């Protein structure tokens, strides 16, 4: 974390990142616990939505988030946009709750029973392999490689699910199996207009390509190291906990903004049966998405409206967080801003 040259800086209890910044074991514990919290939310909220789901009302008009995504994956025996077999959704929700407990227990175990610093383990041991320093590009790229491989495997799982189980096709109005279209020309051409994609085969082809690309990239990052000396030209002095946090916030913010625009207008991936009609982008004090369905009651909103607007504003603030932490990582002291305003208030003009 940025300390501005103060070696004995202290942090308040709510500065959670400070507790893991220089302790790789605690960092893993926080990762596991965080993943457990996300899985707990997904499982608990799915059960909550199932309890209040009304099959007589369009799913997109019930302010649901989890169930529309499960329905889009062809789960729930969907007929005419209605869940007819909620058992599958219940199983998935309960599994998420169970795994959230496992991950939470793992976080507690790593935090209380195992060493807070993986560097204290013997050389050659598996924990030692994942010990890292924020300014060590070789170890960071080694860990990045493992992340990329897991993302690639997740893409493979999605592609195989669509190919053998099937996902919802809004054009057909039914769940069907989808084979991936691995046309590299199509993938290249959709770089700029992927928000307008209308073919599920193309969607799966993009995920299949990503799976291959991420796994190859992951293997590359695991087995390779810096070529030559690590110099300032290559970025020496720029890597730090704060810098990596800023990169992460930028990535999450970008993904959130893409999700906002994609979910607001695309009906191939976000079907109208589950998310409601497409939205219109408007500008006031800030940009926002509005519903276009005239049948909605006053003050009511579709799941698409909630999804797009929440992602848009979260993405916006994530980008602001990226800029904040990136500037701090570069050495900018925001305390100077307050001092500048104080100096302006205390400044006096004298007549010579």
From Swiss-Prot:
<dbReference type="GO" id="GO:0031676">
    <property type="term" value="C:plasma membrane-derived thylakoid membrane"/>
</dbReference>
<dbReference type="InterPro" id="IPR000932">
    <property type="entry name" value="PS_antenna-like"/>
</dbReference>
<dbReference type="InterPro" id="IPR036001">
    <property type="entry name" value="PS_II_antenna-like_sf"/>
</dbReference>
<feature type="transmembrane region" description="Helical">
    <location>
        <begin position="27"/>
        <end position="47"/>
    </location>
</feature>
<dbReference type="GO" id="GO:0009523">
    <property type="term" value="C:photosystem II"/>
</dbReference>
<feature type="transmembrane region" description="Helical">
    <location>
        <begin position="243"/>
        <end position="263"/>
    </location>
</feature>
<comment type="subunit">
    <text>The antenna complex consists of divinyl chlorophylls (a and b) and divinyl chlorophyll a/b binding proteins and binds more divinyl chlorophyll b than does the antenna complex from high-light-adapted Prochlorococcus.</text>
</comment>
<feature type="transmembrane region" description="Helical">
    <location>
        <begin position="203"/>
        <end position="223"/>
    </location>
</feature>
<keyword id="KW-0793">Thylakoid</keyword>
<keyword id="KW-0602">Photosynthesis</keyword>
<dbReference type="Pfam" id="PF00421">
    <property type="entry name" value="PSII"/>
</dbReference>
<feature type="transmembrane region" description="Helical">
    <location>
        <begin position="307"/>
        <end position="327"/>
    </location>
</feature>
<keyword id="KW-0604">Photosystem II</keyword>
<protein>
    <recommendedName>
        <fullName>Divinyl chlorophyll a/b light-harvesting protein PcbB</fullName>
    </recommendedName>
</protein>
<comment type="similarity">
    <text>Belongs to the PsbB/PsbC family. IsiA/Pcb subfamily.</text>
</comment>
<keyword id="KW-0603">Photosystem I</keyword>
<comment type="function">
    <text>The antenna complex functions as a light receptor, it captures and delivers excitation energy to photosystems II and I. The Prochlorales pcb genes are not related to higher plant LHCs.</text>
</comment>
<dbReference type="GO" id="GO:0016168">
    <property type="term" value="F:chlorophyll binding"/>
</dbReference>
<keyword id="KW-0472">Membrane</keyword>
<keyword id="KW-0157">Chromophore</keyword>
<keyword id="KW-0148">Chlorophyll</keyword>
<keyword id="KW-0812">Transmembrane</keyword>
<feature type="transmembrane region" description="Helical">
    <location>
        <begin position="142"/>
        <end position="162"/>
    </location>
</feature>
<keyword id="KW-1133">Transmembrane helix</keyword>
<feature type="transmembrane region" description="Helical">
    <location>
        <begin position="89"/>
        <end position="109"/>
    </location>
</feature>
<dbReference type="GO" id="GO:0009767">
    <property type="term" value="P:photosynthetic electron transport chain"/>
</dbReference>
<dbReference type="GO" id="GO:0009522">
    <property type="term" value="C:photosystem I"/>
</dbReference>
